[in-house]
Curated annotation (Swiss-Prot):
This is Carbonic anhydrase. The keyword Metal-binding applies. It comes from the Eukaryota. Induction: By salt stress. Residues 390-589 are annotated as: Catalytic. The keyword Zinc applies. Keywords: Lyase, Metal-binding, Stress response, Zinc. Its cofactor is Zn(2+). InterPro entries: Alpha_CA_prokaryot-like, CA_dom, CA_dom_sf, Carbonic_anhydrase_a-class, Carbonic_anhydrase_a-class_CS. Zn(2+) binds at residues 420, 422, 440. Residues 59-316, 321-585 form the Alpha-carbonic anhydrase domain. Belongs to the alpha-carbonic anhydrase family. The lineage of its organism: Eukaryota, Viridiplantae, Chlorophyta, core chlorophytes, Chlorophyceae.
């Protein structure tokens, strides 16, 4: 009986794959064919041992019994003009500006906290292990998404996520995807019943790390068919677990709920870029559905609804909203970022034989490290971003003289703000050679800390393979221990690594600076978007050492925080464009 069940499920996958790979809408006839296949599957599975049926009431609607649309009064709004889902035709999209001032006047969705790696949905997470695997949660109250509708700003709070499987609800240019997730958000404005839904498509490919974690956690805490299964210690980060990896372009339109009563009070946001899902993960959805509803089909999508004259608007993602090295490539010039295509860009190749004496640089002096190069300059109150780059955000600096650089006629005092790493390939090269690791200590004009265009100075530290770096060892162990204990999670920002009676402090001299302080200095830019050309670079030429094991930890943190990312985080070398690179403290040729 088990083999027959597998054969029939395979037949269903084949039917659905024909529709999806053929880039055609799933028609009523094809749906009927799929339904017949599932009828056979359901009759076989009905006697399966060990299957837990739903003990409480199922949905009062069912895709198999009522059909793939809601007729006969089940959907109170059937026949009205703004129903969902729809087929999104990308060659007939309207620009977002055309939506403003119209009857459906709606702004771009401000994702706000949903883009943050620290925005965690963790409180009272519960999942419904029946058809659609809906799970609910309490979202944070701060930094919520916003839409301006008819001149009124609405703040939206995420309330639940569910899935439509084996055939997506929306189609894009006639193509149905094998899975579509819907995150439902409710307006927090008094008296408003407005909803906003984010739709995420999945295409066949590698397993999705979040779905893997969700399904495994759910299965370990309950049985298929159970309702309100609590997922203890389960966290959801929307940026990492749900949103597309790189392109945040979405299609927006006015529509409805896709299940009874199909209320027309939804602002839809269907994202263009698809995530991936494996066949094995889709099989879990089928098992859950059949356990909860033995008479049901494993597809739970409503048929495409007529557009009825509505416009669908394209909201192009800002390239620097969420950048990712594997998705955007190793440069930002080809991603519509004009600010990354200037003539004073970083990183560069430092050719030591052509370094000019620092004394010949008339408008910029050497950096006077002052107390930064002492045992006494210890930064406390530091926090860490557990993600790509492993950034340490420095607390307030101790009393004492901060580093000084004379720029033009002004002595500029710089405050250290943070340090982060670029790994497996350094960003700068020295005589054409990449190092495995490069740290960047970012400092800002202390008199203009609030100015986004304020002068920056960055100290670059190279690492070569060798002995483990003691400071990196301590940092990585603290991260690993706290993740293992559940105190923090991958992708979180601003976490403390302090232990009782053992604070996580940073001393620049002992933890970062090499013993020889010769460095190359030049005018450049940030190496990540927006690539602002406001940086005085100081790349120290004597490397520290890092072990292979430490590099592996950087890779693990990156992949756990950014599924789909590459473990290299370097921008490609930029042209010098006539700039002079200077040598200081004996580094000149």
């Amino acid at each position: 009986m088990g083999s027959r069940r597998i054969t029939l499920l395979g037949a269903l996958f084949a039917v659905l794959a024909v529709a999806i790979e053929g880039r055609t809408l799933l028609t009523h006839n094809l749906k009927a064919e799929a339904a017949e296949t599932v009828d056979a599957v359901s009759s076989v599975v009905a006697g399966s041992a060990g299957r837990q049926l739903l003990v409480s009431e199922p949905h009062d609607y069912n895709y198999e019994k009522v059909g793939f649309d809601w007729t006969g009064g089940v959907c109170v709004n059937t026949g009205t003009s703004k129903q969902s889902p729809i087929n999104i035709e990308t060659d007939s999209l309207a620009e977002e500006s055309e939506r403003l001032g119209t009857a459906d006047d709606t702004s771009r969705l401000a994702l706000k906290g949903l883009l943050s790696s620290s925005y965690q949905l963790t409180s009272e997470v519960a999942i419904n292990l029946e058809q659609d695997m809906q799970f609910s949660f309490n979202a944070p109250d701060e930094d919520l998404p916003q839409l301006t509708i008819g001149g009124v700003v609405h703040t939206f709070k995420p309330v639940q996520i569910h899935f439509h499987h084996f055939a997506s609800e929306h189609a894009i240019d006639g193509q149905l995807y094998p899975l579509e997730a819907h995150m439902v958000m409710a307006s927090q404005n008094d008296g408003s019943d407005q909803l906003a839904v984010i739709g995420i498509m999945y295409k066949y490919g590698e397993e999705d790390p979040f779905l893997k974690r969700l399904q495994e956690t759910a299965q370990s805490n309950g049985e298929a068919g159970d309702k309100n299964v609590e997922l203890n210690s389960f966290s959801i980060n929307v940026a990492r677990d749900l949103l597309p990896e790189s392109d945040l372009t979405y299609y927006g339109y006015d529509g409805s709920l896709t299940t009874p009563g199909c209320d027309e009070r939804v602002k839809w946001h269907v994202f263009k870029e698809a995530r991936t899902v494996s066949v094995a993960q889709l099989k879990v959805f089928s098992e859950v559905t059949l356990a909860a509803h033995p008479e049901a089909t494993v597809t739970n999508n409503r048929v495409i609804q007529p557009l009825n004259g509505r416009k669908v608007y394209e909201y192009k993602g800002e390239p620097n909203d969420k950048y990712n090295y594997v998705q955007h490539g190793f440069d930002w010039r080809d991603n519509g970022l004009d600010s990354c295509a200037g003539d004073v860009q970083s990183p560069i190749d430092i050719v030591t034989s052509t370094l000019q004496a620092g004394s010949s640089r008339s408008d910029v002096s050497s950096v006077n490290l002052m107390t930064l190069n002492t045992d006494a300059f210890t930064l406390t109150g530091n926090t860490v971003n557990i993600g790509q780059g492993m950034q340490i955000n420095f607390g307030d600096p101790p009393a004492g003289d901060l580093p000084v650089i004379r720029i033009g006629t002004r002595d500029v005092t710089f405050r250290p703000l943070q340090v982060h790493w670029h790994f497996f390939l350094s960003e700068h090269t020295v005589d054409g050679v990449h190092y495995p690791l490069e740290a960047h200590i970012v400092m800002k004009d202390n008199d203009n800390l609030g100015d986004s265009a304020g002068q920056l100075a960055v100290i670059g530290i190279m690492y070569k393979y060798g002995d483990a770096d003691p400071f990196i060892t301590d940092m990585q162990k603290r991260v690993s221990d706290k993740i293992a204990s559940g105190a923090i999670t991958y992708g979180q920002s601003g976490v403390s690594l302090n232990n009782p009676d053992d604070p996580f402090n940073v001393n620049i001299k002992n933890n970062f600076l090499p013993s020889e302080l010769g460095y190359a200095g030049y005018d450049g830019s940030l190496t990540t978007p927006p690539c602002s050309e406001i940086v005085k670079w100081h790349v120290f030429l004597e490397p520290r050492t890092v072990s292979v094991e430490q590099m592996e930890v950087f890779a693990d943190v990156t992949l756990n925080s950014n599924p789909g990312a590459t473990v290299t985080t370097n921008r490609m070398i930029q042209p010098l464009e006539g700039r002079t690179v200077y040598g200081y403290n004996g580094a000149a040729a």
